[in-house]
């Protein structure tokens, strides 16, 4: 695969969040979308890229707790850690159809999972 499938994107945005187009990028082979809420000061990113041969995921084991979860039918890894100011930060990673997907943010676990289920 040389580029993301046509129309591949994230299709669910929680209430109160706006996309920050200045901090993001979109290319044929990958994208990064950045969202934030002015009200709650929460934010998250959605990063999707085609899987490159030999690509490895690096995980921070020292400060993050990992568990196996499902995103649809795909096996996923959900990491939980704390930011410098004590907020809970989640990082969810999974692969589907030759695409590596990562969502990271200080939003609720339920919202992270709902966003993930609407990436296609």
Predicted regions and their residues:
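Short, solvent-exposed recognition patches
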Residues: 1-96
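Surface-exposed amphipathic alpha-helical segments
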Residues: 97-120
């Amino acid at each position: 695969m040389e580029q993301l499938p046509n129309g591949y994107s994230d299709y669910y945005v929680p209430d109160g969040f706006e996309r920050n187009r200045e901090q993001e990028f979109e290319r044929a082979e990958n994208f990064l979308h950045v969202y934030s809420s002015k009200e709650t000061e929460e934010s998250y990113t959605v990063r999707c890229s085609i899987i490159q041969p030999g690509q490895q995921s690096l995980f921070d084991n020292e400060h993050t707790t990992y568990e196996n979860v499902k995103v649809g039918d795909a096996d996923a890894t959900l990491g939980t850690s704390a930011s410098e100011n004590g907020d809970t930060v989640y990082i969810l990673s999974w692969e589907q159809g030759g695409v590596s997907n990562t969502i990271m943010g200080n939003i609720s676990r339920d919202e992270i999972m709902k966003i993930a289920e609407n990436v296609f």
